[in-house]
């Protein structure tokens, strides 16, 4: 849909801790006997995303595949903000017979936008929740557009609140409209599974055919329709930093989703950020979902305990990387695709010295866009919505960057383009 540039926007998912993490105590080892998949709920506000997440944990808890978390346990963002910890995604762990899932639920709409665009809620697939009472709504469409932009290719639809609808034709209409909408945004509208049910009925153990049985059908559809992703384990380790904690007497923990490679306890690692020279440290512990890991691998949402690093030395947007594999830069050449008005982008063209926000992995940074220097370049030309264009980008601060690094371009609260770094200039 977005030419060749709107592929996977790789980044990390935030790990949600109920309390500050106390890494690597007497935790059991993490079981890797099943494939690990990152999934999430998207959709319009109040359509039942968090209720559905709670219902999934309830149904699976009765089979030993999850710990039941009620709505309040998942939707704890206000409590966390009051304590000064801005954990804006909730991570829930569960297992089906076939897979282990990390499920991300962002209770607030603003959190969704921020986390989907920076890739903090990067998913291998998603469940889009739509209320039978409303059908598709503005945020349904916005989240579909965002999912497409950040590289989510596989969805399952859950039509929620069917217990409040008496007219079967209304449900058919909601399904038909959703299939059309999916096709409009570049998804497989004809073959995407659409499950009808009521998350509330599942939570309250009422009307099993639209309650518990619907949740079971949904999980079967997720198992079957969302492919197990191929993880990039051969490349050098890289983890974009999502959050940082300090543990008294132990050190500093950084959390994030491993983008590629693997990391073992005791290995040396480099912290790369907006400073001139990266600094090295040693990994003293690795944890995922309160289970100890010998190694973190691509796709894991991990907490990494670092030796001799102060809390203020590391911040969101930096990366942990295998030494000498990643460097920070201020100026790059990039191939850009500017979204058309119909794709949710700008309505008007822009010229040289345009200064949007660039969302790169887990950071956002202002950049100035200019046409590359060279003979015959018209520096007064305009870039139109829908154009593919090559431009130089100068960032306001050094940022960890690589050739083939993907990023999103944002302005005024919406995505206006996508980009791919083609050359490092300085």
Swiss-Prot record:
Region entry G3, spans: 105-108
Q: Where in the cell is it found?
A: Mitochondrion
Q: Where is this region: G2?
A: 84-88
User: Boundaries of each tr-type G domain copy?
Assistant: 34-230
Transit peptide start-stop = 1-27
Question: Annotated region G4: where?
Answer: 160-163
Q: Which GO terms describe its molecular function?
A: GTP binding; GTPase activity; translation elongation factor activity
Q: Keyword annotations for this protein?
A: Elongation factor, GTP-binding, Mitochondrion, Nucleotide-binding, Protein biosynthesis, Transit peptide
Entry GO terms, CC: mitochondrion
A Gene Ontology biological process noted in the UniProt record is: mitochondrial translational elongation
What are the start and end residues of every segment in region (G5)? 198-200
Q: Name one Pfam family in it.
A: GTP_EFTU
- Pathway assignment: Protein biosynthesis; polypeptide chain elongation
Q: Which stretches does the entry tag as region G1?
A: 43-50
Kindly list the positions annotated as binding GTP: 43-50, 105-109, 160-163
Q: What does the UniProt function comment say about this protein? A: G-protein that, in its active GTP-bound form, binds to and delivers aminoacyl-tRNA to the A-site of ribosomes during protein biosynthesis. In the presence of a correct codon-anticodon match between the aminoacyl-tRNA and the A-site codon of the ribosome-bound mRNA, the ribosome acts as a GTPase activator and the GTP is hydrolyzed. The inactive GDP-bound form leaves the ribosome and must be recycled before binding another molecule of aminoacyl-tRNA. Required for mitochondrial protein biosynthesis and maintenance of mitochondrial DNA.
NCBIfam families attached here? EF-Tu, PRK00049.1, PRK12735.1, PRK12736.1, small_GTP
Q: Which family does it belong to?
A: Belongs to the TRAFAC class translation factor GTPase superfamily. Classic translation factor GTPase family. EF-Tu/EF-1A subfamily.
Q: What is this protein called?
A: Elongation factor Tu, mitochondrial
Q: To which species is this protein native?
A: Meyerozyma guilliermondii (strain ATCC 6260 / CBS 566 / DSM 6381 / JCM 1539 / NBRC 10279 / NRRL Y-324) (Yeast)
């Amino acid at each position: 849909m977005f030419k060749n540039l709107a592929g996977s926007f790789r980044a990390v998912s935030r790990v949600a801790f109920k309390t500050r993490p106390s890494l690597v105590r007497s935790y059991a080892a993490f079981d890797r006997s099943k494939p690990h998949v990152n999934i999430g709920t998207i959709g319009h506000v109040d359509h039942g995303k968090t209720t559905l997440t709670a219902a999934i944990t309830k149904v699976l808890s009765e089979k030993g595949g999850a710990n039941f978390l009620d709505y309040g346990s998942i939707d704890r963002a206000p409590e966390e903000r009051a304590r000064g910890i801005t954990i804006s995604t909730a991570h829930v762990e569960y297992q089906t017979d076939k897979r282990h899932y990390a499920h991300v639920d962002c209770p607030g709409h603003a959190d969704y936008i921020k986390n989907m665009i920076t890739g903090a809620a990067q998913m291998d697939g998603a469940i889009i929740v739509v209320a039978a009472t409303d059908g598709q709504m503005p945020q349904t469409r916005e989240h579909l557009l965002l999912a497409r932009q950040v590289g989510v290719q596989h969805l399952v639809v859950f039509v929620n609140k069917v217990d409040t609808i008496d007219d079967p034709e209304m449900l058919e209409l909601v399904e038909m409209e959703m299939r059309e909408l999916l096709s409009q945004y570049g998804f497989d509208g004809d073959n995407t599974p659409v499950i009808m049910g009521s998350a509330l009925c599942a939570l309250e153990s009422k009307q099993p055919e639209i309650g518990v049985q619907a949740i079971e059908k949904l999980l079967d559809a997720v198992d079957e329709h969302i492919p197990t992703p191929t993880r990039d384990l051969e490349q050098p380790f890289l983890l974009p930093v999502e959050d940082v904690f300090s543990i008294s007497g132990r050190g500093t923990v950084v959390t994030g989703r491993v983008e590629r490679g693997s990391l073992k306890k005791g290995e040396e690692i480099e912290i790369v950020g907006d400073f001139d020279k990266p600094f090295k440290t040693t990994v003293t512990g690795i944890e995922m979902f309160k289970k100890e890991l010998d190694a973190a691998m691509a796709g894991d949402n991990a907490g990494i305990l670092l030796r001799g690093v102060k809390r203020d030395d590391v911040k969101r947007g930096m990366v942990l990387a295998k030494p000498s594999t990643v460097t920070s830069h201020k100026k790059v050449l990039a191939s850009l695709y500017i979204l058309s008005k119909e794709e949710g982008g700008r309505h008007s063209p822009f010229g040289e010295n345009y200064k949007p926000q660039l969302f790169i992995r887990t950071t956002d940074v202002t950049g100035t866009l200019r046409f590359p220097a060279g003979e015959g370049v018209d520096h007064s030309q305009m870039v139109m919505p829908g154009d593919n264009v090559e431009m130089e980008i100068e960032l306001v601060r050094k940022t960890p960057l690589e050739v083939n690094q993907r990023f999103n371009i944002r302005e005024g609260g919406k995505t206006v383009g996508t980009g791919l770094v083609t050359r490092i200039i300085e």
